[in-house]
């Protein structure tokens, strides 16, 4: 069970099914069982079909109920000049495109964001700006290979493991510390079991030899 106020970092090795999981939430795949949700899921990056259009027109498509002043407020939080609203979307830098789409998606009340690798086209300054912005928001799942970025803006970690999916409170560093501790415990347990197996095998051999001698 996931609280819709959480800021969730989503981690797991490549190929473990992170993208598949997001697509299940978005209703793109058929599945057995039930996914119960009180919110609508939105995906980032939002697909912009015609980048020649004016940015404000695109953002009104993303968040049709938002007022212009609300967009301007969100852009100010992300250190983006509001004049981007009246420029063709394709003239914005990759970082500006990332920021304006995130700002618009967060204006959809009652929606839960699935944010997939938002830092791919961001420089260090823009990453810090987006991390600060996300830290003040709530209600999202964030997929990122940037560990520092995850540490800066999440309060829970959702992890896909070999045998299960689990949720832990904390940021990426605390999750990694717990994960490594668990790995060390399992390794030590396995080594102890192997020693016990070898000891029992040796005992069985000695018993067999003793039995043969008695006979």
Regions found by a protein language model. Give the residues of each.
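Flexible nucleotide-interacting loop at or near the entrance of a catalytic core
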Residues: 1, 184-215
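ABC ATP-binding cassette signature C-motif
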Residues: 1-191
């Amino acid at each position: 069970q996931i609280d819709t106020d959480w800021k969730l970092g989503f981690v797991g090795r490549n190929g473990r099914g992170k993208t598949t999981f997001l697509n299940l939430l978005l209703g793109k795949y058929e599945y057995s069982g039930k996914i119960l949700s009180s919110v609508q899921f939105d995906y980032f990056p939002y697909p912009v079909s015609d980048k020649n259009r004016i940015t404000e027109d695109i953002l009104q498509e993303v968040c049709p109920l938002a007022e212009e002043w609300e967009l301007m407020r969100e852009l100010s939080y992300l250190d983006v000049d509001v004049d981007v609203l009246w420029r063709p979307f394709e003239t914005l830098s990759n970082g500006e495109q990332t920021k304006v789409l995130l700002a618009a998606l967060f204006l959809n009340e009652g929606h839960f964001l699935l944010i997939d690798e938002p830092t791919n086209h961001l420089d260090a300054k823009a990453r810090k700006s987006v991390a600060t912005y996300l830290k003040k928001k709530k209600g999202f799942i964030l997929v990122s290979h940037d560990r520092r970025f995850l540490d800066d803006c999440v309060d829970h970690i959702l992890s896909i493991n070999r045998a299960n999916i689990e949720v832990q409170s904390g940021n990426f560093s605390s999750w990694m510390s717990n994960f490594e501790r668990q790995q060390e415990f399992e390794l030590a347990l396995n080594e102890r079991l192997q020693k016990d197996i070898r000891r029992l095998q040796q005992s069985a051999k000695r018993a067999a030899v003793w039995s043969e001698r008695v006979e």
